[in-house]
Structures are given as structure tokens and as C-alpha cells.
């Protein structure tokens, strides 16, 4: 699937009242519950980054857990819908940008990236996006990744899904926890993983042993 086709698909989905049934699907609620639980493991985040906000369902859950939240999405419609949904919070910054090109000097202590990376053209682009994300994650801090599995994403016309991307993240981060969310539907099957970036206190502690 080309990038133009991806964007056209996203535009159509974002035009409906409940895109991807994010507010009404039991599967999506199960997925969000796991992502939120993992996000809260280390307490509230001083500075968090959410990559891909869809229509704001998870952003609305994540915002109260952060002192500062930066939301990045390539689709202006997604940013606008989420901004309207989360209007009561003033600590959210909005960036319309491809994650491969997003750049900041800020180091985040929580990054959440779910159901996003399979929209990239190929594994080379996924790897580049992952390197960019890892560079923005502070040492000893958490990244939450979620995605439909490889077989499903490839059936949708994408290059790869969860298993491939998890292997790429494991090249530079430490996998701490993995959860499998699924239903009887062939398209409702995803993996959610909590990663930790080695370094800082943990690296010094390991060096002393």
C-alpha cells in the first residue's frame, strides 16, 4: 500500500463518527486498558509523547497522567478531532508531522506509539522511525508499543506488524512486559509491549557488578 493510499484510507476513517470503533469496541477498550496500565507502572509522567492519536480516545485517558504531553500525528484531521476532544487540558502540545521527520531536543520519560508504524512504506522506514523514537526517550524510561500482528498487517497491505517491529525495538531497548489482546475476529489480534531504555542509573548499577 502506498503512502497516498494510506492517507486516503485514514481520511475516510477519520470522517466517520467513531473511527475504527475506538469508543465502542470491546477489543479496543481491552487494548487501551493494557496500554494505560503499562503507562502508569512508574507513576505520572513529567513529559510524555503520543505518536498517532487517531480520534483522541486514548489521548483522553493519557492526558491526566502527564504534566506535559506532546501529540504527533501525520493527519491534520486526527490532530483536530483530538484537540477538540481534549480541550479541557492546557498542557498538551500538538504537532502535525511524520514521525520520521519529527524532531525535538526534549527527552521524554514516556512514549506511546500504537497502531502507527505499519503505515510506513517498508521495514527500512520503520527502522528509521524507531531510531528516532529511541533517541527521544530518556535513559531508564518507558516506551509502550502496540500493533496488530504481522499476518494481519500484511493482509491489510502493509509491510509488517507487531512481531517485526518488536524485534527492531529490541535492538536498542529492553522488553519488560508483553501482552496479547485478541477476540474471535481475524482482525482483532494485537501485541502490546512495554520497553525500557537502558542507561543512566541502571547502566551504572550493572557496571558495578
Curated annotation (Swiss-Prot):
Keyword Ribosomal protein: no
Keywords for this protein: Methyltransferase, Nodulation, Transferase
SUPFAM superfamilies documented for this protein: S-adenosyl-L-methionine-dependent methyltransferases
Swiss-Prot/TrEMBL GO biological process terms: methylation; oligosaccharide biosynthetic process
Keyword Zinc: no
GO molecular function: methyltransferase activity; S-adenosylmethionine-dependent methyltransferase activity
EC number(s) given by UniProt: 2.1.1.-
Family: Belongs to the NodS family.
Biological function: SAM-utilizing methyltransferase involved in nod factor synthesis.
Name under which the protein is recorded: Nodulation protein S
Organism (species): Bradyrhizobium diazoefficiens (strain JCM 10833 / BCRC 13528 / IAM 13628 / NBRC 14792 / USDA 110)
Taxonomic lineage from the root: Bacteria, Pseudomonadati, Pseudomonadota, Alphaproteobacteria, Hyphomicrobiales
Gene for this chain: nodS
